[in-house]
Amino acid sequence: MSNTVVTGEVLDKSIREVVRILEDAVGCTAGPKGLTVAISKPYGSPEITKDGYKVMKSIKPEEPLAAAIASIITQSASQCNDKVGDGTTTCSILTAKVIEEVSKAKAAGSDIVSIKNGILKAKEAVLTALMSMRREVEEDEIAQVATLSANGDKNIGSKIAQCVKEVGKDGVITVEESKGFKDLEVEKTDGMQFDRGYLSPYFVTNAEKMLVEFENPYIFLTEKKINLVQSILPILENVARSGRPLLIIAEDVEGEALSTLVLNKLRGGLQVAAVKAPGFGDRRKDMLGDIAVIVGAKYVVNDELAVKMEDIALSDLGTAKSVRITKDATTIIGSVDSSSESIASRTNQIKAQIENSSSDYDKEKLRERLAKLSGGVAVLKVGGSSEVEVKERKDRVEDALHATRAAVEEGVVPGGGAALLYALSSLDGLKGKNDDEQWGIDIIRRAACAPIKRIIKNSGSEEAPCVIQHLLKQNDKELIYNVDTMNYANAFTSGVMDPLKVVRIAFDLAVSLAAVFMTLNAVVVDVPSKNDAAGAGAGGM
């Protein structure tokens, strides 16, 4: 294996080609009339999806330079997905347009540093303008936000709104595949979520989404640090014999204990994962007690307890219907052994503590515990007549759920690409220090029109230039173009609105990524040698 350095026009041409390929594949999914994409798999039937992030991740060019460029772009899309769970398609469309315009500036011999300064100056102005357009989302608008993100599927929108009503705006909502044929079902169950993720990525069971997913696991709780595997060996052996997974929630798991658990998992032994307990000090102790009540665990092992780790039996452990762990959070869904009486008793105890507390800070923390304990978990079960149908619908449900959370968190702006269009007024008084910096500002002006153009194009209409001209000429910044009805309407009464957080982060990341490519002067890529190819061939003989 040798490598080569690619520079100049060859590099610029490759960047343009890769960006165009990605935008064509991902951009076609934009809007309520966007199309689906089939992704072939090494085994089984192709997966059909409208999830822009999933489409982007699946594109892996064979040519080394193109593969390197695609990888850089996908990493940015991954950030968008991690931060908000939606907006990848918008991010891709914006990135492609900015890079296309920058390529023209480069070809004209413009000063790239000045162009970049103009772009970044315009970016800040647009982001400020977007913030000024936001408004809080009303409870009756939640279904509309979810429907729009689910490509116009009103059933998905109404079910997500039902979930929010069940557990509150800050409640825990998860999505699961159903065994039945019903499109969507909502199930309210006991459960809890806390802000601690897996201690090692090697615990992951779903590599595509970097998740740990356990069904019917045992749950062991301790306030102590676990350094030596010997101390929990009896628990591991008992759980292994049961054939069920194990979740360990402890102050910490480190050293020999963590490495042994990881090695065991990699060798295909016991399905196990470890997370740190939430909170600190006395609050950690209280929160572990809350979790114990939810999962029906008899003990939270600590130094005060006569029962040692080695003495814990299977019947002493907690249980749950399922557990879902990301790198940042753990969600416990549906206890098997807990009782509603024990949960009610614990909540009454916390309510009494709130009454008796004189500290506003303590009261706030107690209310947080009460909300986690009593709120429960809403589970959206996605069904269908085939595995392909279920997976495609689940993608849309998850996107809609992410959009809903973002809308609740930061509010909403006019949808369908209109918000970015109206934010362009912030550039009217913005002047560059020189012609090249002004060119950078104008690049953002053209790029911000790209999402609405793509949404209208995907609807089969060629009216995008006329629509953009009409929206920019009039003064009502709540007016949008609804591609479902092919008419103008008020964004908030018609339900065509986007979460500010999604639009803001997609735009910010797209411009930042394009700025990286602007100053990219060389890429070092590996090139397989003839000897490598011959060796690979000989291995198959």
Swiss-Prot record:
Its EC number is 5.6.1.7. Transmembrane segments: none annotated. It is an enzyme of class 5 (isomerase). Coiled coil: none annotated. ATP binds at T29, A30, G31, P32, K50, D86, G87, T88, T89, T90, G416, D498. GO terms for biological process: protein refolding. Keywords: ATP-binding, Chaperone, Cytoplasm, Isomerase, Nucleotide-binding. One of its GO terms (molecular function) is ATP-dependent protein folding chaperone. It catalyses: ATP + H2O + a folded polypeptide = ADP + phosphate + an unfolded polypeptide. It is found in: Cytoplasm. Together with its co-chaperonin GroES, plays an essential role in assisting protein folding. The GroEL-GroES system forms a nano-cage that allows encapsulation of the non-native substrate proteins and provides a physical environment optimized to promote and accelerate protein folding. HAMAP family: CH60. This is Chaperonin GroEL. It comes from Anaplasma phagocytophilum (Ehrlichia phagocytophila).
